[in-house]
Regions:
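Claisen-condensing/thiolase-fold acyl-transfer catalytic domains that form or cleave C-C bonds
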Residues: 1-105
Length: 105
């Protein structure tokens, strides 16, 4: 998720339809979005943790997904078979969503 601000992950999870509106904050507080939770989200810690290289954020997200799907990520999500990268740019005027899968996982 493109979480350049703390609230962004919560908004994104709800806007993308993963969690019902008004419930994403409680999911995060309960650990349900942790790497071992019901809906692992940003196991690297997201943009706030690893940095926000404007213009290269999407490449970083895809790299992280590839490592997850290959089973080589330091914060590996157990049984990762599919991943979603969500990125924003240009003050919210550009949005991309990429879905990657490892059929051999």
């Amino acid at each position: 998720m493109h979480d350049c601000f703390s609230i962004a992950e919560i908004i994104d999870l709800e806007d993308l339809g993963f969690i019902n509106p008004g419930h994403a904050a409680s999911w995060a507080e309960e650990g349900r979005t942790d790497s071992n939770g019901d809906l692992p989200t940003n196991p690297s810690g997201g943009l706030i943790s690893k940095g926000h290289p404007v213009g290269a954020t999407g490449v970083g997200q895809i790299f992280e997904l590839c490592k997850q799907l290959r089973g080589t990520h330091p914060n590996q999500v157990r049984g990762a078979k599919i991943g979603l990268a969500h990125n924003l740019g240009g003050c919210g005027v550009t949005c991309s969503v990429s879905i990657l899968a490892n059929p051999n996982a």
